[in-house]
Amino acid sequence: MRDRLPDLTACRKSDDGDNAVIITVEKDHFMDAFFHQVEEIRSSIARIAQHVEDVKKNHSIILSAPNPEGKIKEELEDLNKEIKKTANRIRGKLKAIEQSCDQDENGNRTSVDLRIRRTQHSVLSRKFVDVMTEYNEAQILFRERSKGRIQRQLEITGRTTTDEELEEMLESGKPSIFISDIISDSQITRQALNEIESRHKDIMKLETSIRELHEMFMDMAMFVETQGEMVNNIERNVVNSVDYVEHAKEETKKAIKYQSKARRKKWIIAAVVVAVIAVLALIIGLTVGK
């Protein structure tokens, strides 16, 4: 009967090799999918950044006109909706990545892939918080400038209000009461009345928008704060690596320079030795000749 052990061993090795290939391929596919998701998030963040710039432009147009066109305000509202929708989508994806990393960490998987995912997640979270902070600052600035326009219109009508009084009127959230109070105090022009009413409505919308962003900010900003040191360490290591490479280049240049000088000195010493030997040989020759 023929011994089948070598064949079985070969088959087992072949199976093990196939399994290793399958695991490697699955791993590669997983990281490919992850990096694809990273690029999608980066693109979404870049899209929000562009929308924020458009929002700022619309803010400037609205503030520069006493009664801006409805089209501009509609465009601004659409931009705000798109930013919030995209931001919530990004937030969901970042949460999913965070949970995936936590699961792998709890399973004692501390592979290079996990560290890469953690780093990418931290970098993306920071970029996301940065762009949303810029958006929030634009909203707050628009609110303050709109409030300033209302104050100026009130001053034109002869009514002076403090910041506290204006804030109290704005926080009431009832434009009709707000305007009726103004009318009862002074005879106001229709144009000034329309602008005050328009600015008041803008501020009411902003209040809602800023409140909606608050939860997202608290959630993402806290994560970035806890993970920030890791990102800073990575950035520090990269900078140190670059400095080390530059230092190594300088040291290499110095070594080559010193080596060149040393080689030149060797040739000079050799030439001097040869000259001395030649002189000694000449002296000895002359002495013997006598």
Curated annotation (Swiss-Prot):
Give residue spans on the Cytoplasmic membrane side.
1-266
Report the residues modified as Phosphoserine: 14
Report the PROSITE patterns cross-referenced here.
SYNTAXIN, T_SNARE
InterPro entries found in the cross-reference section: SNARE, STX2_SNARE, Syntaxin, Syntaxin/epimorphin_CS, Syntaxin_N, T_SNARE_dom
- Tell me the membrane topology, using the record's own terms: Single-pass type IV membrane protein
Q: Does the keyword Calcium apply?
A: no
What parts of the sequence cross the membrane? 267-290
Q: Where in the cell is it found?
A: Membrane
Q: Which GO terms describe its cellular component?
A: basolateral plasma membrane; cell surface; cell-cell junction; cytoplasmic vesicle; endomembrane system; extracellular space; lamellipodium; membrane raft
The record's CDD domains line, in alphabetical order, gives: SNARE_syntaxin2, SynN
Summary of the tissues where the protein is detected:
Heart, spleen, liver, and testis.
Asked whether the UniProt record includes Transmembrane helix among its keywords, one would answer yes
Q: Which intervals hold domain t-SNARE coiled-coil homology? A: 193-255
Give me any GO biological process, just one: acrosome reaction
Keyword annotations for this protein, in alphabetical order, are:
Coiled coil, Membrane, Phosphoprotein, Transmembrane, Transmembrane helix
UniProt-recorded Gene Ontology molecular function terms:
calcium-dependent protein binding; SNAP receptor activity; SNARE binding; structural molecule activity
Give coiled-coil spans as residue ranges.
Answer: 69-106
Protein family according to the UniProt entry: Belongs to the syntaxin family.
Quaternary structure and partners: Interacts with SYT6 and SYT8; the interaction is Ca(2+)-dependent.
Function (record text): Essential for epithelial morphogenesis. May mediate Ca(2+)-regulation of exocytosis acrosomal reaction in sperm.
Under what name is this protein listed? Syntaxin-2
**Organism (species):** Rattus norvegicus
**Protein's gene:** Stx2
